[in-house]
Amino acid sequence: MCIRDSDYPYSKVLPNALVTVKPVDDGSYFLQLDDSTTLLPVNMTSSPFGQKEVRALVNFDETNESSGIYSKAVNINWIDSILTKPIAPDLGVTSNDSIYGSDPVEIVNDWVTIAEDGYLTLRFRTIWGDRNKAHFVNLLTGKDPENPYEVEFRHNAYGDVYGAYADGLVAFKLDSLPDTNGKTVKLKLKWKSFDGDKSVEFNYCSRKSTPAKASIAAERSALNLK
């Protein structure tokens, strides 16, 4: 029997949230949706990511079950972790270039490119030839002594610079930056694009969210990253 397109639950295919998966000491976990909203998964009682705190795309439905101390109870339809990394150590100009690379990317302005909950999550676009070859992506602190909230995105393609454009997702934990102590500051992101050096600013507050875009990403990161 053939399934008609109209029968296919497209609402279950796309992510409807970007969350932080937060393990709890008793082996359970919850999802941090935004600055004030927490989600309790009731159909998946242990995190598929073990005791790791990670950023993830998720598709969920709210339920009427008890959420206890959390804001809402949800059923998870699917959840897919995003590569989640700390800020990388500064190795000096020469070593930074040789190890972290300086290959160009474009930062995509959509709902998953956001500073929230102590993370900078980025959707980026670059050229990919060999999908089996991992590209190395990192976030470094900036060189401006007057601005401790300046960071730089680095990309090492390891010579894989011919092919088609494709998108990747990565999240960086910002806990090594100075605590904003409840204040909202400007987080400046710098990167090398295909058109030269670029930068953008995000509203950033330690462990506090900033508004997301309303659109939905059509696909998850399908690229090999490390």
Region spans (language model):
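First exposed extracellular module after export/assembly in secreted or surface-exposed proteins
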Residues: 12-226
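Conserved small/polar residues in nucleotide/adenosyl-binding loops
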Residues: 1-6
